[in-house]
C-alpha cells in the first residue's frame, strides 16, 4: 500500500522529508504547499542542498508543480491551510512543516481541504506526540492530528527507554549540543524573547532552552517529571549530540549499559537506534537515518548508579526519516493492518 502525502511548508524539514519520502516504498509525495516560494525556485532548492548534497534523482518544474523522477507533484501557494485543496491530488496524510500551525486547532485546518490526518513535524502544545520505537503502538485511528515531537526528543526517548526498561531511570539531566538552525542569526540581531539567541550562530556557543527532555515524559509516562534539559547551540550546520546524565534504580556497570544498548539496537529498536564503538565526530553522522546513534566509547560512569550517556543524531535527516516512518505506520493502523 502506497500512502499519498502532502507537505505544507517547503523549508528545511519539508525538503528533507521530501528527499526521504522518495526513498520510502510506502510513501508518495503528491502535493506541496508554500506561499513564499515559486515553483521553479522550489525545484532548485530541492535539487541542491549545501548540507546533504545534490538530489540523486531528476527534478524538473512545470507551471503547476514539480516532476520528480517522472512523477508529478502538484505545487500550491495558499497562505491559509484551510484553502489548500489536498483532495485534488488524493493527499490523505499531510505533513505540517511550516513551524507555524503546531496546535491541534491550527493544524486541523488541513482537514477542510480533504486531508484525513495531519502530522506536525514539530513539538505540539496539545496534539498527541509519537516517537517511533517508543510509543507509536499507542496510536489509535480516531486521532486526526498528531505530532512527531522534536528531533532531540526522538534521540533522547529511545535512549531513556532502554535505561528505564533495563535498570530503572530515577532522574536525569540532558544537554543537547545542537547545530544551529534557521531561527538563529547570521550576524548579531534583535531577539526580544531570547537575547542570547540573537547572537551570531557561526561565532558562538549559545545556551538555550529546550522542552525536549520534558517531552519524553509525554511519550513515556513513567518518566514524567524525571527528566529536564537544556541546549547548547554550536557553530556546526548539521548533526547534534545528546548528553544524558542520569541516576539508575538498579546497580549497573557501564559495560552492562553498553550491552543493553547494543541488544536494543539489534532488536526492538532496530532502524531507530544504532550502536557504535567507533571514534565518531559529528560530520560522520551527516545523513544517518537513525533517531539515535549510541556512542559506546564516549560515555562514562561515576559509580554503579550514576552514568553519562552520549548519543548522536542527524537533526535534519534522521528526524525527517521518522516523519515518513510514522506516516507509513499510522496508515497501516488506519487500514486495519
Curated annotation (Swiss-Prot):
GO terms for biological process: glucose metabolic process; glycolytic process. Keywords: Cytoplasm, Glycolysis, NAD, Oxidoreductase. The lineage of its organism: Eukaryota, Fungi, Dikarya, Ascomycota, Pezizomycotina. Gene3D superfamilies: Dihydrodipicolinate Reductase, domain 2, NAD(P)-binding Rossmann-like Domain. Signal peptide: none annotated. InterPro entries: GlycerAld/Erythrose_P_DH, GlycerAld_3-P_DH_AS, GlycerAld_3-P_DH_cat, GlycerAld_3-P_DH_NAD(P)-bd, Glyceraldehyde-3-P_DH_1, NAD(P)-bd_dom_sf. Pathway: Carbohydrate degradation; glycolysis; pyruvate from D-glyceraldehyde 3-phosphate: step 1/5. Its main location: cytoplasm. The record marks 178 as: Activates thiol group during catalysis. It comes from the Eukaryota. Its EC number is 1.2.1.12. It catalyses: D-glyceraldehyde 3-phosphate + phosphate + NAD(+) = (2R)-3-phospho-glyceroyl phosphate + NADH + H(+). This is Glyceraldehyde-3-phosphate dehydrogenase. It is found in: Cytoplasm. CDD domains: GAPDH_I_C (cd18126), GAPDH_I_N (cd05214). Belongs to the glyceraldehyde-3-phosphate dehydrogenase family. One of its GO terms (molecular function) is glyceraldehyde-3-phosphate dehydrogenase (NAD+) (phosphorylating) activity. NAD(+) binds at residues 12-13, 34, 79, 315. GO terms for cellular component: cytosol. Homotetramer. The keyword Kinase does not apply. D-glyceraldehyde 3-phosphate binds at residues 150-152, 181, 210-211, 233.
Amino acid at each position: 500500500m502506497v500512502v499519498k502525502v502532502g507537505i505544507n511548508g517547503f523549508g528545511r524539514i519539508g525538503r528533507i522529508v521530501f528527499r526521504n519520502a522518495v526513498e520510502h516504498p510506502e510513501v508518495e509525495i503528491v502535493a506541496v504547499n508554500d506561499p513564499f516560494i515559486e515553483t521553479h525556485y522550489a525545484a532548485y532548492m530541492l535539487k541542491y542542498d549545501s548540507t546533504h548534497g545534490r538530489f540523486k534523482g531528476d527534478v524538473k518544474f512545470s507551471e503547476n508543480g514539480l516532476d520528480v523522477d517522472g512523477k508529478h507533484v502538484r505545487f500550491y501557494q495558499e497562505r491559509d491551510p484551510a484553502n489548500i485543496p489536498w483532495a485534488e491530488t488524493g493527499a490523505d496524510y499531510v505533513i505540517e512543516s511550516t513551524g507555524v500551525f503546531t496546535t491541534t486547532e491550527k493544524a486541523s485546518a488541513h482537514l477542510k481541504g480533504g486531508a484525513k490526518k495531519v502530522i506536525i513535524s514539530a513539538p505540539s502544545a496539545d496534539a498527541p506526540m509519537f516517537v517511533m520505537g517508543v510509543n507509536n503502538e499507542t496510536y489509535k485511528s480516531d486521532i486526526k492530528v498528531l505530532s512527531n515531537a522534536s528531533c532531540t526528543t526522538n534521540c533522547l526517548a529511545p535512549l531513556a527507554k532502554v535505561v528505564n526498561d533495563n535498570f530503572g531511570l530515577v532522574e536525569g539531566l540532558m544537554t543537547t549540543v545542537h547545530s544551529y538552525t534557521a531561527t538563529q542569526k547570521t550576524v548579531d540581531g534583535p531577539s526580544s524573547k531570547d537575547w542570547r539567541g540573537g547572537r551570531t550562530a557561526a561565532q558562538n556557543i549559545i545556551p538555550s532552552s529546550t522542552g525536549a527532555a520534558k517531552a519524553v515524559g509525554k511519550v513515556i509516562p513513567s518518566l514524567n517529571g524525571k527528566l529536564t534539559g537544556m541546549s547548547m547551540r554550536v557553530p556546526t550546520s548539521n548533526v547534534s549530540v545528546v548528553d544524558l546524565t542520569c541516576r539508575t534504580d538498579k546497580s549497573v556497570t557501564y559495560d552492562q549499559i553498553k550491552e543493553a544498548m547494543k541488544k536494543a539496537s539489534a532488536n526492538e529498536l532496530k532502524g531507530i537506534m544504532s550502536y557504535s564503538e567507533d571514534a565518531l565526530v559529528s560530520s560522520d553522522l551527516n545523513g544517518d537515518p537513525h533517531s539515535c546513534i549510541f556512542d559506546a566509547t564516549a560515555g562514562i560512569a561515576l559509580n554503579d548508579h550514576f552514568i553519562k550517556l552520549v548519543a548522536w543524531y542527524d537533526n535534519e535527516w534522521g528526524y525527517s526519516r521518522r516523519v515518513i516512518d510514522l506516516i507509513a505506520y499510522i496508515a497501516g493502523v488506519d487500514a486495519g493492518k
